[in-house]
UniProtKB/Swiss-Prot annotation:
InterPro entries: GPCR_Rhodpsn, GPCR_Rhodpsn_7TM. GO terms for cellular component: endosome membrane; plasma membrane. Residues 1-64, 131-156, 211-235, 317-329 are extracellular. Orphan receptor. Has spontaneous activity for beta-arrestin recruitment. Shows a reciprocal regulatory interaction with the melatonin receptor MTNR1B most likely through receptor heteromerization. It is found in: Cell membrane; Endosome membrane. It comes from the Eukaryota. One of its GO terms (molecular function) is G protein-coupled receptor activity. The keyword Transmembrane applies. Interacts with MTNR1B. Interacts with ARRB1 and ARRB2 in a spontaneous and agonist-independent manner; leading to the internalization of GPR135 in the endosomal compartment. The gene is Gpr135. This is G-protein coupled receptor 135.
Amino acid sequence: MEEQARPPGRPAASATLQGSAHPGGAASTATAAALSFSSVATVTLGNQSDAGRPEAAGSRGPAPLLWHGAAVAAQALVLLLIFLLSSLGNCAVMGVIVKHRQLRTVTNAFILSLSLSDLLTALLCLPAAFLDLFAPPGDSGPWRSFCAASRFFSSCFGIVSTFSVALISLDRYCAIVRPPRDKLGRRRALQLLAGAWLAALGFSLPWDLLRAPREPPAPQSFHRCLYRTSPDPAQLGVAYSVGLVVACYLLPFLLMCFCRYHICKTVRLSDVRVRPMTTYARVLRFFSEVRTATTVLIMIIFVMCCWGPYCFLVLLAATRQGQATQAPSLLNVAAVWLTWANGAINPVIYAIRNPNISMLLGRNREEGYRTRNMDAFLPSQGLGFQARSRNRLRNGCANRLGACSRMPSSNPASGSGGEVVMWARKNPVVLFFREGPPDSVMEVGKLHNSETRDSSI
């Protein structure tokens, strides 16, 4: 009688297969497929928290060990690739911005904050993932504090990255949509950056360790501690977890979409209303703003794709209210790795959108650059050469950019020439973002009275 009163336990895999009414039916096939996917996911995850239990260790045969080793090697290779791209790429971006004074603009300050947060994520969070791959299963033991610190850094720098991209979108919105007097100044940019870092620090503090837990924490493995969603709804409550996701991720995502929508609307209206462009500085500025807006759009898409699954899992854990008692699934691991991969994707975007980045890294201001940026070259030349270069650039833009096809050409022979490539010795190429063309370039555009007015942004 006592045995009949005991609550039924979870049936074994073999019992599940044998207990189906029709062994050859659809239910048996679906169950077998689910069990096969579960076994593959268990091997792929590496050091699972359930691997430390005796029944799990005894069921592992020699064949799964080979798959386990291959899975660990593949995971280590992916983590190494993310680490190298994040560390080296973001160091290069930060070095370019800090090295050249002309690149120290307001938008590049937000880029610097984004690169710094991605670099710190690679240096302080990825080592814990490497340790999890090769650490023995079982209780985390002495690594419990290291695991909590890694989760804190991952959450803090992730929030900073999201805020930085939102600030970049806001800066581009003010530069393109709003009047020039509404642009973000350096002082306001520093205040926004300081507020973003302080807010990320406050939201990411391990409040579950500073307050008395609702229930004694159960022993957990290093893998379960590392890939547990942060914040944990089981420890901090559902309201806090949902509020953090909304304030730190969903609202910045909405701000990015709002800014991007108005930027696209303004660019489309400007493309329709603009007259034939006759000033090369206006041409450069217009297409520079469009290219910048496209780069920001690419960054926004990758941020949403990398952080969207993580936010969804946090909200899902909040609805279940049982995160602390569950082992991290394959989706948890993939979501955390996607957030880390976002820091490696951003430098790749910069390199693709700015192919001359190696020249900025290899040369200083005194040595000069081989550049297509006329703004960096013409101010150091005479007025006669500036007038001739203006005509050549005008014809080059007419060939490359269809919007400039109606510009008058004073040098037909140069119309078939390729891109204008100069050697600039004074000013570096503004690869990332700039606030507007230099004053000396605008003075060149004022040589003719008919070129002083333009309706482009």
